[in-house]
Amino acid sequence: MKIIVVYTFCLFFANLSLSQADNNKVQSAINEFASAAGLENAAISFMAYDIDNKTTIASHNGEMAIAPASIVKLFSTATAFETLGKDFQPKTEIFYDGEIDSNGVLNGSINIKGGGDPSLGSRFFYDRDQQSAFLNEWVAAIKSKGIKEINGQIITDGSEFGYDGAPDGWSWSDLGNYYGSGPSGCVVYDNMTYLHFSTSAQLNDVTTLDSMTPRIEGYSLLNQVTTYNSSSDNCYIYGAPYSYDRFAIGNLPKNRSNFEVKASVPDPELLLAQEFEKALANDSIFTTTRPAGFRSMLLQGALPIDYSDKKEVLSYSGKSIADVAFWTNMRRLERLKLVTVALQEALITSIDTGSRDSTSKCTKRMEVGYQEVMLSVQTIL
């Protein structure tokens, strides 16, 4: 029996094992929860619905629409399982154009075609010192083609999901922070960078940004963060997608060195190209032209890249939908936004090849698959 359980609380509700025989227990459990001391003024909406039998298993204010928060990720991950399958792995493909001469010089460019793999260099799948290990595999693939030098550039193409940067409606106060990282056809390192601060021993004193990992060329931070007498991070980064001008406000603990604050990456597509160029240079394979993201080329009038006349170097598979969904559902908000929308974009691309639909259209198409569920999901995202 297929059962979809959707619950939206101001507090987290414990997972319930559902079967037809346990229906009364489910209703009793939600009634007990809703009547608990301290929840008298809480907004609680719950419904468990049996799609096969088209019957309500249990309900408490089931028709009341409230802000669903992190629970909406269940729609994306469930639809990904249903549509793509648990074993689906997004791919990042590497191509080259031009010819390789007798000296190993490629007279052409390397193209990286992103497939929206949210696991590429992700801290959820790799230890900190192994997050860039995939680049070594990519470099080895380039060398296997006999390429020793590139008379051209690295071009990353994240156009598979379009270039919205972030869905409409995302909070301005989120976008510059790590939990506000938007989806991209080229995702790398969770589209996140670590800012390393040192702080004074004095209260209400200035802080200093010492470095960042990975280093992002052109990143500029107006730092208005001061010290305070606490051990927690109360720093907030502000900045729009594709904008390298950021500013920071709030507080950090006093008398610290190398205090890390996580922030979003302005342009993941370009960062991936730059990271690959560095990895090649570390193996003495140099390019003659600086790396570029395809978005900037589009702004200059470039046409979509035709891969039919290019030669494939490597097709790199990311983690499976099952693996990605596990971490998405089990972790808090920090992982929800980027991966949930990345899954939605992957879904819409699989349904409509070549589509450049916005996130709002992806969500509307997801609603169609859940019309039998007695919920209003118009407010998702």
Q: Where are the regions that the model predicts?
A:
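Active-site SXXK
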Residues: 54, 68-86, 154, 186, ...
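Short, well-structured active-site flanking segments
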Residues: 83-97, 289-291
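Bacterial Sec-dependent N-terminal signal peptides
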Residues: 1-24
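Extracytoplasmic
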Residues: 41-43, 61, 69-72, 89-91, ...
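Polar, glycine-rich mid-to-C-terminal structural blocks
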Residues: 107-231
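Soluble periplasmic/extracytoplasmic beta-strand elements of cell-envelope proteins
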Residues: 45-49, 57-59, 93-95, 109-115, ...
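A small/polar active-site loop signature that marks catalytic segments
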Residues: 226-381
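Beta-lactamase-like hydrolase cores
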Residues: 20-52, 56-64, 138-146
